[in-house]
């Protein structure tokens, strides 16, 4: 069987759902949205309750659960690489931190030939267009967009306030909005949660607007096998439904839009014959277009947890016990309030570790419990932790297809920690985190250091801890980068170089990873490119002011050295 649409979107994630919603605002445009995962089950607390964020990472229903090849600089560990599966993509299983990146990230992109319109002031209107912030709009925030953003409220956990205060006492700036005028410093962290306390994935915020439109067709459990071409023009998609092996063909009159994420987008392009010719020939894949950058330039954020015992019973450790969870769940389900309605990442910060960095190179997430991101290895006592990670590692990895079978995962190698700068940043980061945690604001709460532990002090000891314990922050990106150099895959509008009717729109097209979590920026990029696809005028540039550190010192004098 075959069907025909104006546009076919492959992947209903943070970007694909934006494109599906915006393109079908034009009633004369037909769109097919293909998603390999299932629906956004609204009664499944695992994806709807913010505090349950660890659960989707533990199974396979919502998580592709990729693994890396042995990482050579990480004691050859095979490392987790979770990616979302289902309507919403990774916005269905992420930590819900609403962080956009630093203004200078985007100004850096705009210095690349062909990317001049990706400056911060060009991007800010699209961040605002996507957002509804619960305390109202301003120059930096939107008031009527599809993404619900919730700010921390008075009366939340005292550890959040103590950790921010400790950062300020350590000599770093205070900022009231990590997405506003000044990212650098410590302050409250916004989250993608609805006013009713539900996860604000793009399947909810965007697709709910568009589902009823007659010009949008959504097919779930549809695994795209390959893109179909006539010469250099993309003309359709062959996909498999459920566990079946009989391909279904859909044709695109205008364009095929690949929104499968930083792992699956290059994998799909390579499987379709677009990528490094030698790799494709090794797998007997006919080369449609030799494009060496497909799957190259892969980047991610790596992070560590620094954990402390808590002397007062104020952490959320009791909430990790099964006997307390029914009451928490009921309060969330019926009232949309309480511990269940928060992702518990309500404070954080960004700092520069050395004068050489023009903008922050380390991010902190503060958490009022001592536990792994995926819910494992919880410390069996009251505790708290800082997630600390470097933001713009010089290490580069790659995605290589291993098979023509669309159900087989690709070979993934990030080359984490492959540069001396990586080691320097993490050593600096651990030592500076300890200084922050040692400030007077945390005196009422801070018990012994649980991890790494006070015995871990020398460079060699820190390096061994990093090798064994650093984990992904789940931010793969840049594997189909925008630009005009020989390794660029797409131009500044997501159009694949050397091809017609084919775009990539997702985190894979970032030329360089940003300073912060990726979801908000991925949504912004899709909003921006949607206007290009529709032939609309770009939104007017913002005139908002933003902070540039310039000659400002990295930090002031700490209260306690």
Curated annotation (Swiss-Prot):
InterPro entries registered for this protein in UniProt: BetA, FAD/NAD-bd_sf, GMC_OxRdtase, GMC_OxRdtase_N, GMC_OxRtase_C
Cleavable signal peptide: none
Active-site residues are: 475 (proton acceptor)
Give the source's domain of life in one word: Bacteria
Q: Where does FAD bind?
A: 6-35
EC?
1.1.99.1, 1.2.1.8
Q: Which UniProt keywords apply?
A: FAD, Flavoprotein, NAD, Oxidoreductase
NAD as a keyword of this entry, yes or no, is yes
Q: Name one GO molecular function term.
A: choline dehydrogenase activity
Q: Which PROSITE patterns match?
A: GMC_OXRED_1 (PS00623), GMC_OXRED_2 (PS00624)
Q: Which pathway, metabolic or otherwise, does it act in? A: Amine and polyamine biosynthesis; betaine biosynthesis via choline pathway; betaine aldehyde from choline (cytochrome c reductase route): step 1/1
Keyword DNA damage present in the record's keywords: the answer is no
Q: Which Pfam families does UniProt cross-reference here?
A: GMC_oxred_C, GMC_oxred_N
Q: Its catalytic activity?
A: choline + A = betaine aldehyde + AH2; betaine aldehyde + NAD(+) + H2O = glycine betaine + NADH + 2 H(+)
GO terms for cellular component: membrane
Q: Name one GO biological process term.
A: glycine betaine biosynthetic process from choline
Record's family? Belongs to the GMC oxidoreductase family.
The UniProt function text for this chain reads:
Involved in the biosynthesis of the osmoprotectant glycine betaine. Catalyzes the oxidation of choline to betaine aldehyde and betaine aldehyde to glycine betaine at the same rate.
- Protein name per UniProt: Oxygen-dependent choline dehydrogenase
Top-down, what is the taxonomic lineage of the species of origin? Bacteria, Pseudomonadati, Pseudomonadota, Gammaproteobacteria, Pseudomonadales
Q: Which gene encodes it?
A: betA
């Amino acid at each position: 069987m075959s069907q025909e649409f104006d546009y076919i979107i492959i992947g209903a994630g943070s970007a694909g759902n934006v494109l599906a919603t915006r393109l079908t605002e034009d009633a004369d445009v037909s769109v097919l949205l293909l998603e390999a995962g299932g629906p956004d089950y609204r009664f499944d607390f695992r994806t709807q309750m913010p505090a349950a964020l660890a659960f989707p990472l533990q199974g396979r229903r919502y998580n592709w659960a990729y693994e890396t090849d042995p990482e050579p600089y990480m004691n050859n560990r095979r490392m987790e690489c979770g990616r979302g599966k289902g309507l919403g993509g990774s916005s269905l299983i992420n930590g819900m931190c609403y962080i956009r990146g630093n203004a200078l990230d985007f100004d850096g992109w705009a210095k690349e030939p062909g990317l001049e319109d990706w400056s911060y002031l060009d991007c800010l209107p699209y961040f605002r267009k996507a957002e509804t912030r619960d305390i109202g709009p301003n120059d930096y925030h939107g008031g009527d967009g599809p993404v619900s953003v919730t700010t921390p409220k008075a009366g939340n956990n005292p550890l959040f306030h103590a950790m921010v205060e400790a950062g300020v006492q350590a000599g770093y700036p205070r900022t009231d909005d990590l997405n506003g005028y000044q990212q650098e410093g410590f302050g409250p962290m916004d989250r993608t949660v609805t006013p009713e306390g539900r996860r604000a994935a793009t399947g909810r915020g965007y697709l709910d607007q568009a589902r009823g439109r007659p010009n949008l067709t959504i097919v779930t459990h549809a695994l795209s096998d390959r893109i179909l071409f006539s010469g250099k023009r993309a003309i359709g998609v062959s996909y498999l439904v459920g566990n079946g092996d009989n391909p279904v063909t859909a044709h695109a009159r205008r364009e095929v839009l690949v929104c499968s994420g930083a792992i699956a987008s290059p994998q799909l392009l390579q499987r379709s014959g677009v990528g490094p010719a030698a790799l494709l020939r090794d797998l007997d894949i006919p080369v449609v277009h030799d494009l060496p950058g497909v799957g190259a330039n892969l980047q991610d954020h790596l992070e560590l947890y620094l954990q402390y015992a808590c002397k007062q019973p104020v952490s959320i450790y009791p909430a990790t016990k099964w006997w307390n969870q029914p009451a928490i769940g009921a309060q969330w389900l019926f009232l949309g309030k309480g511990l269940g309605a928060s992702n518990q990442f309500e404070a954080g910060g960004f700092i520069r570790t050395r004068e050489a960095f023009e903008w922050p190179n380390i991010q902190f997430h503060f958490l009022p419990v001592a536990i792994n991101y995926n819910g494992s290895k919880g410390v069996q006592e009251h505790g708290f932790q800082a997630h600390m990670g470097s933001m713009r590692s010089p290490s580069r990895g790659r995605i290589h297809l291993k098979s023509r079978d669309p159900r087989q995962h690709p070979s993934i190698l990030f080359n984490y920690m492959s540069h001396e700068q990586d080691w320097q940043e993490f050593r600096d980061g651990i030592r500076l985190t300890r200084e922050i945690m040692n400030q007077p604001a945390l005196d009422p709460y801070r018990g012994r250091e649980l991890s790494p532990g006070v015995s871990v002090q020398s460079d060699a000891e820190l390096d061994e801890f990093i090798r064994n314990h650093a984990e992904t922050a789940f931010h793969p990106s840049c594997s189909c980068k925008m630009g005009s150099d020989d390794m660029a895959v797409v131009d500044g509008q997501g159009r694949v170089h050397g091809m017609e009717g084919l775009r990539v729109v997702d985190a894979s097209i970032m030329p360089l990873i940003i300073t912060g979590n990726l979801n908000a920026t991925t949504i912004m990029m899709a909003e921006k490119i949607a206007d290009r696809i529709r032939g609309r005028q770009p939104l007017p540039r913002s005139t908002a002011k933003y902070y540039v550190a310039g000659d400002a010192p990295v930090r002031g004098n700490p209260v306690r050295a």
